[in-house]
């Protein structure tokens, strides 16, 4: 029987063996297709010293091997010395002590990779002592609610409060005694019976310790008359933080006579009728809090006494949410040599820190790994990059994670895929990464020659296994890093050392993207091996792009060549118009095309180069590549590269200098492994060096020992904020490294948003390097209040937020409103000239700004006033001097006249003179008068004088009678027909005397001298008066009139003509020669003629000339 059984077994052996192999193979494929998961996470625990702690971890699939970590270190199974036991995914701490507290993680491993759980924190329970305090006396109005506060000591977990009331310990609310979650005791409707001593105690539910306060509070209940409402608790505004899902009680206790009524409002709206809120007396209770419960709550008390709304207190409630993490895919397959991008959506409040892990090992940024809070990018994927990737998020209230499995495929399928794509579409080959990332695009030109579709495995130049052939060398890029085109770029290259025993190039892969702060997706193009040119299109103007390209042969991806370039800027229409107008204004004959010529009048150092890009050269060296900008009018002579270590505070260090301008890339050697660096570049010409370029992105030198820096916990502290102007706020802060166990930081994040915004997405972020402790936030809105907070960060993540500061920008300055002129009302403005209308005025023209208009007007007015004063002062001085001189001239000093008998012309303005029957006469200023001639003996004519306002006198036969228009000032009679001694009076000057032998004729102020041309028409003989030296002067009684009396001689001579009318004094007898019957050429009327030898005056009657002395004016 046994033999038959054995025979049957032997006959079935091949079938059983095959079945076992199939099952094993199926299990292997199942392992490859399954993504490891931790379905039950270990929970954080608080235990007393010496207590037992049990941590559980459930994984899927369950056959995975589970290990544990303590504070990031692997626990090699059970450790008796440490007191830790590990059995079937469960960790047991037999006796908790200071060595076994910390963060625990379970790690599940399988051939496809490893996954780690979220950290579980194990801490020791403790209860501290009460702080020393003094006794407080609490007074409350009868019928109101009293509050006894208890300041609980520090406890972990939170201690429970107990009160000693009337020699009895109260552990829960009872009667009119309410024990609140905050630890306060509220005594409702207090009365005289509630007076007494109250004491509180703290109870730790884990250690079961009880500690009592060292001081007591005394309650007094008083009886008062009417009293306004007041809030006795809380004494000031409060900020409450609650975790999502928990209940919240906001306390508000008011006092007053009569007892006040308490109302609640949230963000300005009443909470009455809100489903989630209830009232516990005057306190507000919120069940199962959520994010929408965050906001500002207002408690207001009013009893009708005093000013309404005076008793108000505010609560600022923040609901914290544990993180939620989601990832789009659970599995991803990427061909070798291509890039993979993993996105991670993280939610939570406060914003969680994000940690990326591969096979349960934390990742740090490097040239191939680009990490951010929302995405992980892996460049040039290879077999070593396969595994399970985790996005783990953590904040103050919890942690969460998501998992994706990343697999790679061999590049040998690439030619086949390329051939299939080309045969189907007739376009250049699609990059293999297009299969892994559908968003990536293929850009190229159609109908390109097809490269070889396959390479036989027997070919000596293309071995079948990867690694047996040498990878292709990096192509040589020939294109310039700058282009004038705004939306395209011509990429040109050539292979390096093609042939030389290497496998032939099958195709090229070109990747390009815009260089921004957040990594964008690469645009990938596959190019045939015989094509060495590619036009990149649909680019943004004035933007910086980076290009990576590599050649592929049967050995896979070759070495990578990199270049960065900048597209041309698109000129703005208004800028072009202003430039053309400026050129036409400066040189009307110049054409707009001349604007393209450089302006050598503006010479300066070069502009700062663009931000450099960093690529790996070796384990301890990198390539720094940059693009120059403007040269400042002189050619760039050299470049210099500087670097800075991010984990150390210090200045920038010169890496290399004297780099020729033909080189736009340099290798920096001697870098420390595991150290993060930033690089920047300067350009130099003969006028100096440029400003430094923007620092490069952090670069971590590979070969690090694997140490992971923990994220900083404590953030910075903002110490100062100030509004610099209407769009800029400056802030300063302090950071204490000791608060984070001297954990190195890379820099700070500054968040700001308008204060009136409640949306966290409105926050904008600025990044500042770690060695700076001040920053200016620009491009803000005028007269707007902003909330400002900060974080510090390093490779491990971001710290907690700092304190929040509120600062308001300054108001925008008015554009000349106070000094604006009113619109014209009398006359409209003059229309501009045709030239002004037709000629365009550029923006660079000298136009007064509206804000300068008031100052311009004030300056013009003041300048005009000063000019008028300066002009008027000399005129007044001249006028005064002229009057004074005129008065002195009329005084007739004898010694002042020269012997040539000069005279001053005094035109007697007024009506013009007339002639009648050939007889001339003179006209006065306000009337007409016939001139009187004065005839001396021997026929010497003296002259004629006309006085204003005189009636006409008939001097010659047939002369017309003239009618005066005004009353006469001087009345004069014809001396030949009869003489009136009272009709002529001469006014003497105030300082003259008869002894001086001179008289002063006072003429009107507006009188002038008039020159009468001599006429040959003779008049009849006239009898003219002449002043006599021996004359008397007397004052008429009761009259300010001086009378000068003299004997006028008469002479009968030949006909005479009217001569000149001077008003002067004859200095000597030489001025009038009378011998031989000659005429005196000039002679003043009314002048004093002394009785000098050779002169005889005919006797005649006494003549009186009367003048009224006018007031002296200056």
Curated annotation (Swiss-Prot):
It is found in: Cell membrane. Residues 474-571, 608-703, 712-812 form the Fibronectin type-III domain. One of its GO terms (cellular component) is axon. Residues 972-986 have a biased composition (Polar residues). Residues 31-855 are extracellular. It comes from the Eukaryota. This is Brother of CDO. It comes from Homo sapiens. The lineage of its organism: Eukaryota, Metazoa, Chordata, Craniata, Vertebrata. The gene is BOC.
